[in-house]
Amino acid sequence: MDEDVLTTLKILIIGESGVGKSSLLLRFTDDTFDPELAATIGVDFKVKTISVDGNKAKLAIWDTAGQERFRTLTPSYYRGAQGVILVYDVTRRDTFVKLDNWLNELETYCTRNDIVNMLVGNKIDKENREVDRNEGLKFARKHSMLFIEASAKTCDGVQCAFEELVEKIIQTPGLWESENQNKGVKLSHREEGQGGGACGGYCSVL
């Protein structure tokens, strides 16, 4: 681990096939967008280091497949994760309806009780919306999740989603602290009075 890196975090991106998980990942890690991106088979894996509130964290981001036939592969992917981004497509209500199934799977396979979950409504650049923002916000509040709407195509909300998730994880020392006890790392604290989250309150911290 780099000396100035506070911790390495395992982040999962889950949700139904076609909601834009891979597009969100590539926009965040490589700042690219491919409208013809093929569905992920199995899992994709990216690493990116970011700085939030003066704390540098290395993210190991796992993009899990949404197809039902790959569900049997997921238990090992959930193991040890500190954060999860659960994605639905705001233009496809069926992907929103199935969020409960993903939460049940997360509860079944996740090895941590204090894992941080972020709900992302993707594809807000499209006009044929089927899921209102307030519906997403209500669902997130019900399940104590962070929430944001985003567009991998236009980049709206993408950086914020990851930064807000990482900020919340860092604020939950039990998620990562034990792995760094012998490394002499220190958490940098935001100056008193500074608030609104990593993105100035753009995300809802619930």
Swiss-Prot record:
UniProt keyword list: Acetylation, Cell membrane, Developmental protein, Endoplasmic reticulum, Golgi apparatus, GTP-binding, Host-virus interaction, Hydrolase, Lipid droplet, Lipoprotein, Membrane, Methylation, Nucleotide-binding, Palmitate, Phosphoprotein, Prenylation, Protein transport, Transport
Main location: endoplasmic reticulum
Enzyme Commission code: 3.6.5.2
Protein name according to UniProt: Ras-related protein Rab-18
Activity control, per UniProt: Regulated by guanine nucleotide exchange factor (GEF) RAB3GAP1-RAB3GAP2 complex at the cis-Golgi membrane which promotes the exchange of bound GDP for free GTP. Regulated by GTPase activating protein (GAP) TBC1D20 at the ER membrane which increases the GTP hydrolysis activity. Inhibited by GDP dissociation inhibitors (GDIs) which prevent Rab-GDP dissociation.
Native organism: Homo sapiens (Human)
Gene3D superfamilies given in the database record: P-loop containing nucleotide triphosphate hydrolases
UniProt note on tissues of expression: Ubiquitous.
Family annotation (CDD domains): Rab18 (cd01863)
Cell location: Endoplasmic reticulum membrane; Golgi apparatus, cis-Golgi network membrane; Lipid droplet; Apical cell membrane
Keyword Lyase: no
Location of the motif Switch 2: 63-80
Functional description taken from the UniProt entry: The small GTPases Rab are key regulators of intracellular membrane trafficking, from the formation of transport vesicles to their fusion with membranes. Rabs cycle between an inactive GDP-bound form and an active GTP-bound form that is able to recruit to membranes different sets of downstream effectors directly responsible for vesicle formation, movement, tethering and fusion. RAB18 is required for the localization of ZFYVE1 to lipid droplets and for its function in mediating the formation of endoplasmic reticulum-lipid droplets (ER-LD) contacts.
Pro-sequence residue ranges: 204-206
